[in-house]
């Protein structure tokens, strides 16, 4: 009777049109329901049945209905699909191929088929794959996917590395080698013979791609520092297929226990690596540094042939400097180490007063077994040898920034603008509330930003440091010279890591043109600088994601025990705290309910960066060091969950006043004026 009734269809359409609609982003939960997030302050509940039609992150238009006296959102139209290409695990259901996305908030199995060229019979339960979403339930009535790539079987020991690289669409291996390598520029760029100069390298004990060597001598009023940098552009022609591949990769990918080079290993680890006792082509800079640490303007760039006279390690040099350890090395190199130490201390002192010095944070080194298992995590503090190399490289990059800025006018510059324009008002409001002696125009300038950072670094608490960083901009790559507020410098152009950074290869070619007196190559495109910026962030995510996986495996045995860790609060969110364990660098999450299972009394306030008890008492804040215990280590989501080592036991909740008379004691009653 009602089938194909046009009047009924028209009535339904009219009813639908009269239902209010909202656009927003779907935020899933781990309990089946979700929310439609319209803006920062507005969200609507999405019941589990409606969540079956969408995925976390989808942008949708939804009908806002009232069900059981509560407003709920029913997704109605897909505006932007959040998932297209994704990493998943194979799930067999009644002998049919399904995939489950490797995402903590996307848990439902999706029907799947394989792309042409793959054999469905080869896939088994738990295999890791890359898939593409082909059908969306809100559009097509159901979800379906196509498996496009095999990553690894569940038994593969390399799963953390291969899965993370595949997720970010990065190569697992280095570029293909060439049958023969030839220097392409010998006649055009004469090289000074410095093979007799006692250059030396300082690197990690396991480092193979050594790209910088140093030599120093004392002058009457300071030091002369020679910085020799490996020269892969002597072998890689601009515009060649290998050059294009290096540009696409942008950086060597560094991960716990391994790396994927930007250029073939024959170059990075052999022909260009500045190995002890082997002659190498290099690009060099001669720097002059005054006794007080001032880096003088006079800088000479030139091509040279060098031979490293000693391969030193950070630990050996630091042990020599800090504990008097004897070093059995070339006498010419040994005589330079006191000079390096003195120059480094002078440069640190100068930059601390006139620029900015990054706070010393330790590195964390994963010691892995043959099958990729984590045997130990070693804390490696930044010691004097690390600072020797760091200060030398920073000085060399400052000089490159000067030369490229003045003589070329472009290059690949690292720029950092301090605060984004739209963040300045928020930053100054925060500083005023903290009684900081700064004005808006002041902190927008390079000198004012440096003064602010130095003032904050001298505070007893790290709370303001954690808060103000939320307003700071990200560092970018730019073809134009520009200030780097984070370092407190007018210009900064890196050229000291061309084996592992494509931007440094670009700067090498421009510096070589200056040396040869030739017209420099073309200005780097906006497309290239944006690509380099994006890849730098991506590679940090890769290192973090693999680290998170390995941390969960390593710390699983400590979860649920009474082992206590020191942890720094690095973020305060509405749901809880994010902390970094100081013993090993792992990032853990402490849910608010683990602090106090009473959401009426406990508030985790992101805006203030603090956790409050009963609205007033500060329990925790950004930058605070607290003791925690691990409760869970969940490999499926690569998450570590913690709780306070000492349980918070608050006093009785304050009693709310029952009347205005109760709220104002007699002795505090307002006086008549």
Swiss-Prot record:
Stretches assigned to coiled coil: none
One annotated GO molecular function: exoribonuclease II activity
A single cellular component GO annotation: cytosol
Residue segments, region Disordered: 650-673
InterPro entries attached to this UniProt entry: CSD, CSD2, NA-bd_OB-fold, RNase_B_OB_dom, RNase_II, RNase_II/R, RNase_II/R_CS, RNase_II/RNase_R
Protein EC: 3.1.13.1
Recorded catalytic activity of this chain's protein: Exonucleolytic cleavage in the 3'- to 5'-direction to yield nucleoside 5'-phosphates
Keyword vocabulary terms for this entry: Cytoplasm, Exonuclease, Hydrolase, Nuclease, RNA-binding
Span of domain RNB: 191-516
Role description: Involved in mRNA degradation. Hydrolyzes single-stranded polyribonucleotides processively in the 3' to 5' direction.
Protein's recorded name: Exoribonuclease 2
Record organism: Aeromonas hydrophila subsp. hydrophila (strain ATCC 7966 / DSM 30187 / BCRC 13018 / CCUG 14551 / JCM 1027 / KCTC 2358 / NCIMB 9240 / NCTC 8049)
């Amino acid at each position: 009777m009602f089938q194909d009734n046009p009047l009924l269809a028209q009535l339904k359409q009219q009813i639908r049109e009269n239902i209010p609609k909202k656009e927003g982003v779907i935020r899933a939960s781990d309990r089946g329901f979700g929310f439609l997030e319209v803006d920062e302050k507005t969200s609507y509940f999405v019941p589990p049945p409606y969540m079956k039609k969408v995925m976390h992150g989808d942008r949708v238009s939804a009908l806002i209905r009232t069900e059981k006296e509560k407003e709920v959102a029913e997704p109605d139209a897909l505006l932007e699909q959040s998932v297209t290409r994704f990493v998943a695990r194979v799930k067999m259901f009644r002998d049919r191929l399904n995939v489950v996305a490797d995402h903590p908030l996307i848990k439902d199995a999706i029907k799947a088929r394989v792309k042409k060229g793959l054999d469905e019979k080869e896939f088994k339960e738990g295999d890791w794959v890359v898939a593409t979403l082909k059908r969306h339930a809100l559009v097509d009535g159901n979800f379906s996917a196509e498996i496009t790539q095999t990553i690894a079987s569940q038994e593969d020991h390399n799963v953390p590395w291969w899965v993370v690289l595949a997720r970010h669409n990065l190569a697992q291996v280095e570029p293909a080698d060439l049958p023969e390598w030839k220097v392409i520029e010998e006649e055009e760029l004469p090289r000074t013979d410095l093979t007799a100069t006692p250059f030396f390298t300082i690197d990690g004990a396991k480092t193979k791609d050594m790209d910088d060597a140093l030599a120093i001598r004392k002058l009457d009023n300071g030091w002369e520092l020679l910085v020799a940098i490996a020269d892969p552009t002597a072998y890689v022609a601009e515009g060649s297929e290998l050059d294009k591949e290096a540009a696409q990769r942008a950086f060597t990918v560094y991960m716990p226990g391994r790396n994927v080079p930007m250029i073939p290993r024959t170059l990075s680890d052999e022909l260009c690596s500045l190995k002890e006792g082997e002659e190498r082509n290099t690009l060099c800079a001669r720097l002059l540094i005054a006794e007080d640490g001032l880096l003088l303007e006079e800088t000479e760039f030139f091509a040279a042939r060098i031979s490293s006279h000693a391969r030193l390690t950070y630990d050996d040099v630091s042990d020599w400097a800090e504990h008097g350890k004897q070093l059995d090395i070339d006498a010419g190199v040994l005589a330079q180490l006191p000079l390096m130490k003195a120059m480094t201390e002078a440069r640190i002192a100068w930059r601390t007063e006139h620029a900015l010095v990054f706070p010393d944070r330790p590195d964390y080194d994963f010691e892995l077994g043959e099958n990729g298992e984590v045997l130990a995590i070693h804390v490696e503090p930044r010691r004097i040898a690390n600072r020797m190399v760091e200060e030398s490289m920073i000085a060399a990059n400052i000089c490159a920034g000067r030369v490229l800025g003045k003589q070329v006018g472009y290059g690949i510059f690292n720029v950092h603008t301090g605060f984004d324009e739209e963040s300045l008002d928020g930053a100054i409001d925060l500083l005023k509330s903290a009684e900081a002696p700064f004005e808006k125009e002041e902190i927008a300038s390079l000198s004012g930003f440096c003064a602010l950072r130095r003032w904050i670094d001298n505070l007893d608490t790290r709370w303001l440091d954690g808060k103000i960083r939320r307003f700071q901009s990200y560092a970018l790559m730019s073809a134009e010279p520009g200030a780097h507020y984070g370092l407190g410098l007018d210009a900064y152009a890196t050229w000291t890591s061309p084996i592992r950074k494509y931007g440094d290869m670009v700067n090498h070619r421009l510096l070589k043109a200056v040396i040869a007196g030739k017209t420099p190559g073309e200005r780097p495109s906006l497309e290239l600088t944006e690509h380099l910026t994006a890849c730098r962030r991506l590679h940090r995510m890769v290192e973090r994601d693999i680290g998170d996986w390995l941390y969960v495996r390593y710390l699983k045995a400590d979860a649920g025990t009474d082992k206590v860790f020191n942890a720094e609060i690095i973020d305060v969110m509405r749901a809880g705290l994010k902390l970094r364990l100081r013993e090993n660098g792992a990032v853990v999450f402490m849910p608010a309910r683990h602090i106090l299972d009473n959401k009426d009394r406990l508030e985790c306030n992101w805006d203030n960066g603090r956790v409050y008890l009963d609205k007033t008492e500060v329990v925790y804040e950004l930058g605070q060091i607290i003791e925690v215990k691990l409760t869970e280590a969940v490999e499926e989501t690569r998450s570590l969950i913690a709780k306070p080592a000492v349980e918070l036991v608050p006093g009785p909740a304050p009693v709310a006043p029952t009347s205005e008379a109760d709220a104002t004691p007699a002795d505090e009653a307002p006086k008549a004026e």
